[in-house]
Amino acid sequence: IYVDQCKLKFYELSENTNPVTTCTDYIHANYQNDITLSFLCELVHLNRTTLNQRFKQQLNCTCIEYLLHYRLKISQELLSNTNLKIDDIANQCGFKYGSYFNRQFTKCLGISPSEFRKNPTGYSMFEGDKVMKL
């Protein structure tokens, strides 16, 4: 609990901070951990609806969609550049279950993680900083 309180203090909003930026910075630094929408709402002092509306306006996706796609982006890098087992990559990217990771990866990219590893070029879920709608 103390560590979570310290994280909250570190990411606490100032008056001029964009809540979406605060959340994405937190996600980038902590994607491998359990992150909930409730926690992110608490982090930026907004309710779920408002936070998701701001994410949709700025990034074309909800907060949790962004988290999922960011985790999948990291997994693409690991699949391309390491020989780690797919279940280990899933775990390192914050997925509790390898089967869920496989399902989401295949759903979002149209190719399984093992197929992606064989031919990793030409697949992306991001266009600049925005999540592409697939």
Role assignments for model-derived ranges:
Residues 1-11, 50:
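An amphipathic alpha-helical interaction segment
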Residues 28, 34-70, 90-115:
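Basic/polar phosphate-binding segments, predominantly the helix-turn-helix DNA-binding elements
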Residues 1, 21-29, 54-58, 134:
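Short, charged low-complexity intrinsically disordered segments located at boundaries
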Residues 8-35, 41-44, 68-84, 126-128:
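A short, Lys/Arg-enriched amphipathic alpha-helix from helix-turn-helix/homeodomain DNA-binding modules
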Residues 2-3, 31, 83, 121:
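Secondary-structure transition/hinge residues
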Residues 103-134:
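…primarily DNA-binding HTH/wHTH and HhH modules…
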